[in-house]
């Protein structure tokens, strides 16, 4: 099938809203992306056409005296871009990754499916969210999000891309992240510097990049801030590290952080916040921290007792492949498509 993916915030090539839908589709479906907050241009990323709506600058910030007008203009621009791309791509339906995208597809009168990657603050009984879900052909959400009326389908990535390695020593830690307040990258910098000798890299992009780069310059080379890498290049990147770190504020009771799955599949020892999904589901496979100082202590302990972590790393690899295989959501998604789009699926 031909699927137009509509989203507000996705970073093409990098974020979970890019990786998990494309891994879900595999080679069975063709995709095109419309991204509300991306620059207004058309390009191709990993062979996938991407159109930015261009809701930036003045339109991206609240207007004190005319906020309703600004929102109406933003919604209109997003909706018209979705309509145009739907026709140009000859799409079968729109896959919406958030409520804003779903609202635009609904207003456009197009067939749409909700695959909720991001909650925009609406509660389950919010009338706007209910209208969006009721108007969808079907709706799904991540298993840690619990949206009433949405089928829970894990947002798994294809772990077969990653190469499991058993490094002889632990010398460098990685934070693969969005560089924004929610992911608190400064905690990683402070944690590395509170350890005795660990070195680490932040790989990603986001609005705090300039400030984090400045912090890293003051570490004497122990912490670097590196550019993001594309989805298909992440396995090669992980080969250079031994410890994977996941920071992040407690924005939900259980936070699904896809990077942790990649860490574990690649043989990295994982240190994460206690509310990350794996820390809740398999606490014996990771270490958790509440403060930069505690992160530094874990880094020292793991480095000092690296060989002793081997059984844990092996169990983590087996557990993540067993519980987060992409074949499970692919099978569930395929079944839903056959139920709701039998003619298109049989083409």
Regions found by a protein language model. Give the residues of each.
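Active-site proximal beta-strand in glycosyltransferases
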Residues: 3, 93-95, 105-122, 137-139
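A charged, aromatic-enriched C-terminal amphipathic alpha-helix characteristic of glycosyltransferases
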Residues: 304-342
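Acidic anion/phosphate-binding donor-loop and adjacent secondary structure
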Residues: 124-126, 150-172, 184, 334
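Conserved donor-binding/catalytic core segment of Leloir-type glycosyltransferases
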Residues: 4-6, 165-201
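Nucleotide-sugar-dependent
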Residues: 183, 232-234, 244-262, 271-281
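Nucleotide-activated donor-binding/catalytic signature segment of Leloir-type glycosyltransferases, i.e.
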Residues: 210-238
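N-terminal subdomain of nucleotide-sugar transferases
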Residues: 1-42, 193, 275
